[in-house]
């Protein structure tokens, strides 16, 4: 009995050690950067989480914004559906995202909004085509679940504005739009931040 317990302890310790080593290796390795967008590229707007039925006008504004940058925009098949608190069923939301990932002509996937529901489709997705041909996944809030998963797989994503962000006061998001465009097209970004005097010098 004691021998069995010792064996189990040793076995579990080995697994934990291997997992820690793997995690450290993943942290050290550089993330793969998907190709930046160019004029003429196509992006897809999808809704992996919440409802957009009453936000079509705002999503259309997002489409017009992307088009003003020289991009083509396609909507997910179920973008404006409604199923309870979700934009569509788990299967349908997965279908839209999978279609966008698998289509080689689509160079970026832009989330229409967050809310809740993205985590429910993560395990339904097949990332084979994405790994073969990475593309930018864009959004924040609930879309962070996708960022986390894709970062774990080794790919960069953009934690940035969503389609519904176009519903904000235009004057307040001018700088957001500028930095968002630069992020998509691979232009250099620079930030000027005022430090807080209460911060300790050794803080990082």
PLM features: what roles do these ranges have?
Residues 50-52, 80-81, 115-117, 143-146, ...:
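Solvent-exposed loop/turn segments at secondary-structure junctions
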Residues 99-124:
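Long, hydrophobic/aromatic-enriched structural stretches that serve as scaffold segments
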Residues 73, 108-110, 138:
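Structural motif
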Residues 127-150, 156-163:
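Short, acidic/small-residue loops that bind anionic groups at enzyme active sites
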Residues 156-204:
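Conserved anion/nucleotide-ligand pocket segment
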Residues 1-27:
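Bacterial Sec-dependent N-terminal signal peptides
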Residues 24-105:
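ATP/NTP phosphate-donor binding region
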């Amino acid at each position: 009995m004691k021998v069995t317990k010792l064996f189990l302890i040793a076995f579990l310790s080995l697994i934990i050690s291997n997992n820690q080593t793997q995690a450290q290796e993943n942290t050290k390795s550089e993330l793969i950067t998907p190709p930046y967008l160019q004029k003429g590229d196509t992006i897809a707007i999808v809704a992996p989480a919440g409802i957009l039925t009453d936000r079509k006008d705002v999503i259309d504004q997002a489409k017009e914004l992307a088009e003003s940058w020289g991009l083509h925009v396609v909507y997910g098949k179920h973008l404006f559906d409604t199923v309870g608190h979700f934009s569509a069923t788990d299967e349908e939301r997965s279908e839209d995202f999978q279609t966008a990932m698998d289509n080689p002509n689509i160079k970026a996937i832009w989330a229409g909004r967050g809310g809740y529901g993205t985590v429910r489709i993560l395990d339904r997705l097949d990332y084979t085509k994405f790994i073969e041909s990475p593309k930018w996944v864009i959004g924040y809030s609930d879309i962070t679940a996708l960022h986390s998963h894709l970062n774990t797989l080794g790919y960069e994503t953009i934690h940035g504005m969503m389609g519904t962000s176009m519903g904000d006061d235009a004057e307040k998001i001018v700088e957001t739009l500028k930095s968002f465009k630069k992020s998509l097209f691979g232009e250099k970004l620079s930030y000027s931040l005022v430090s807080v005097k209460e911060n300790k010098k050794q803080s990082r």
